[in-house]
Amino acid sequence: MVLSKKTIMQSFALMIILSIVMSTTEAKTIGNPAMREDEPKGCPPGSPASCKMQPANPYKPGCEASQRCRGT
């Protein structure tokens, strides 16, 4: 099995290109602010005590007409 000179040169060029691309890639990490769970979102980092967490969707029980609830 003989490889042609063209195939060898293409393989060599591909290895060089891949090594350049891999060396210039920088990995991005998740910082600590994204992992803070003890502070509410949208509060200043220096004074989280000044913020009060509001429920996103307060509970409201539903009522169907067959249950004869008030207001229906």
Swiss-Prot record:
Family: Belongs to the plant rapid alkalinization factor (RALF) family.
GO cellular component: apoplast
Protein name per Swiss-Prot or TrEMBL: Protein RALF-like 20
Role according to the record: Cell signaling peptide that may regulate plant stress, growth, and development. Mediates a rapid alkalinization of extracellular space by mediating a transient increase in the cytoplasmic Ca(2+) concentration leading to a calcium-dependent signaling events through a cell surface receptor and a concomitant activation of some intracellular mitogen-activated protein kinases.
Gene for this chain: RALFL20
A Pfam family reported for this protein in Swiss-Prot or TrEMBL: RALF
Keyword Signal: yes
UniProt-annotated location(s): Secreted
Matches recorded under InterPro entries: RALF
Alphabetical GO biological process terms: calcium-mediated signaling; cell-cell signaling; regulation of growth
Listed PANTHER family: PROTEIN RALF-LIKE 15-RELATED (PTHR34270), PROTEIN RALF-LIKE 16-RELATED (PTHR34270:SF3)
Position of the signal peptide: 1-27
One annotated GO molecular function: hormone activity
Primary subcellular site in the record, as a coarse category: secreted
The keyword Transmembrane helix is assigned to this record: no
Disulfide bonds listed in the record: 43-51, 63-69
UniProt keyword terms in alphabetical order: Disulfide bond, Hormone, Secreted, Signal
